[in-house]
Curated annotation (Swiss-Prot):
Chlorophyll a 5 binds at residues 212, 230. Chlorophyll a 6 binds at residues 245, 254. It comes from Oryza sativa subsp. japonica (Rice). This is Chlorophyll a-b binding protein 1, chloroplastic. The modification N2-acetylarginine is found at residue 33.
Length: 265
């Protein structure tokens, strides 16, 4: 169950995207922006990821994509069996949710794997398995970040929740509102202070980065789902599960665990 493959770059089948404008992100958001500069095109002509001649979900074996999937947005591979992209307003909302969750999943997958990787290479900083580290907040002694009580010592899950709501609510509000002056046109890719390295300065490179982001984000969401299932079924971290599988793939695989798993035991 080696789910930590978020760095792959092969195309992933995904919900595709209809043509829509930034106004579909909600009337309330548009009124919060004081300026509305024309957004840059998604990509130049000739890109393999955009337009009518883009890469499709089954390559040359793909059927004709629905008429509303024009290849305007990153991650559109012409596949929408359930018709989730048929309604432009519904699609605009789902597209935003997918991008935001993709970003959180990429951060989460890294946070699940990296501490365990360090621990397996001799770095000592307390509990390395992601779900076991988090559960320490419910112990009598509380949780020490990085195993060091002099850094951050947390004892209340409610306090952590409140801090998260305030901090993340402020950042999300800033993003959705278009910055302090409401000058950002696209809340999904706000740029400015959210792009200190200037990765979006080149339109063609930026269009390709959008594709890489959504592809890796979709893989990361599957990875996080796999990490949760592994934690419930095996009680081990993702790297330990990977090591067990490589050592004995016949007895340590998804099918073997699924046929022997008994909830609560």
């Amino acid at each position: 169950m080696a789910a930590a493959t978020m760095a792959l770059s092969s195309p992933v089948m995904a919900r595709a995207a209809p043509s829509t404008s930034s106004a579909l992100f909600g009337e309330a958001r548009i009124t919060m922006r004081k300026t509305a500069a024309k957004p840059k095109p998604a990509a130049s002509s000739g890109s393999p990821w955009y337009g009518a001649d883009r890469v499709l979900y089954l390559g040359p074996l793909s059927g004709e994509p629905p008429s509303y999937l024009t290849g305007e947005f990153p991650g559109d591979y012409g596949w929408d069996t359930a018709g989730l992209s048929a309604d432009p307003e519904t699609f605009a909302k789902n597209r935003e949710l997918e991008v935001i969750h993709s970003r959180w999943a990429m951060l989460g997958a890294l946070g699940c794997v990296f501490p365990e990787l360090l621990a397996r290479n001799g770095v000592k900083f307390g509990e390395a398995v992601w779900f076991k580290a988090g559960s320490q907040i419910f112990s009598e002694g509380g949780l020490d970040y990085l195993g060091n009580p002099s850094l951050i010592h947390a004892q209340s899950i409610l306090a952590i929740w409140a801090v998260q709501v305030v901090l993340m609510g402020a950042v999300e509000g800033y993003r959705i509102a278009g910055g302090p002056l409401g000058e950002v046109v696209d809340p999904l890719y706000p740029g400015g202070a959210f792009d200190p390295l200037g990765l979006a300065d080149d339109p063609e490179a930026f269009a390709e980065l959008k594709v890489k982001e959504i592809k890796n984000g979709r893989l990361a969401m599957f990875s996080m789902f796999g990490f949760f299932v592994q934690a419930i079924v095996t009680g081990k971290g993702p790297l330990e599960n990977l090591a067990d599988h490589l050592a004995d793939p016949v007895n340590n695989n998804a099918w073997a665990y699924a046929t022997n798993f008994v909830p609560g035991k």
